[in-house]
Amino acid sequence: MRCLPVFVILLLLTASGPSVDAKVHLKTKGDGPLSSFRDNAKSTLQRLQDKSTCCGYRMCVPCG
């Protein structure tokens, strides 16, 4: 029975404490946006396609 007032006081202190902004997000090194990853993949594929032009229908062979 002695624990009940302590529990109530702690509950009131917790509820009246300063609010924390839940949307604060600290970015780390690996938290880049997914769109930049897609852009990098597209540019890499475009660069590889520009370096070797496909001459055949079934096999992609670099032309001279």
Curated annotation (Swiss-Prot):
<comment type="similarity">
    <text>Belongs to the conotoxin T superfamily.</text>
</comment>
<dbReference type="GO" id="GO:0005576">
    <property type="term" value="C:extracellular region"/>
</dbReference>
<feature type="signal peptide">
    <location>
        <begin position="1"/>
        <end position="22"/>
    </location>
</feature>
<feature type="modified residue" description="Cysteine amide">
    <location>
        <position position="63"/>
    </location>
</feature>
<comment type="function">
    <text>Chi-conotoxins inhibit the neuronal noradrenaline transporter (NET/SLC6A2). Of the 3 native isomers, only the isomer with a ribbon disulfide configuration shows pharmacological activity and 3D structure similar to other chi-conotoxins. This ribbon isomer (disulfide pattern: C1-C4 and C2-C3) inhibits the rat norepinephrine transporter (IC(50)=10 uM). In contrast, the globular isomer of PnID shows more than ten times less activity against this transporter and the beaded isomer does not display any measurable biological activity.</text>
</comment>
<feature type="disulfide bond" description="globular isomer; alternate">
    <location>
        <begin position="55"/>
        <end position="63"/>
    </location>
</feature>
<keyword id="KW-0528">Neurotoxin</keyword>
<keyword id="KW-0800">Toxin</keyword>
<keyword id="KW-1015">Disulfide bond</keyword>
<keyword id="KW-0732">Signal</keyword>
<feature type="disulfide bond" description="beaded isomer; alternate">
    <location>
        <begin position="54"/>
        <end position="55"/>
    </location>
</feature>
<keyword id="KW-0027">Amidation</keyword>
<feature type="propeptide">
    <location>
        <begin position="23"/>
        <end position="51"/>
    </location>
</feature>
<keyword id="KW-0964">Secreted</keyword>
<dbReference type="InterPro" id="IPR031565">
    <property type="entry name" value="T-conotoxin"/>
</dbReference>
<feature type="disulfide bond" description="ribbon isomer; alternate">
    <location>
        <begin position="54"/>
        <end position="63"/>
    </location>
</feature>
<dbReference type="GO" id="GO:0090729">
    <property type="term" value="F:toxin activity"/>
</dbReference>
<feature type="disulfide bond" description="ribbon isomer; alternate">
    <location>
        <begin position="55"/>
        <end position="60"/>
    </location>
</feature>
<dbReference type="Pfam" id="PF16981">
    <property type="entry name" value="Chi-conotoxin"/>
</dbReference>
<protein>
    <recommendedName>
        <fullName>Chi-conotoxin PnID</fullName>
    </recommendedName>
</protein>
<feature type="disulfide bond" description="beaded isomer; alternate">
    <location>
        <begin position="60"/>
        <end position="63"/>
    </location>
</feature>
<feature type="disulfide bond" description="globular isomer; alternate">
    <location>
        <begin position="54"/>
        <end position="60"/>
    </location>
</feature>
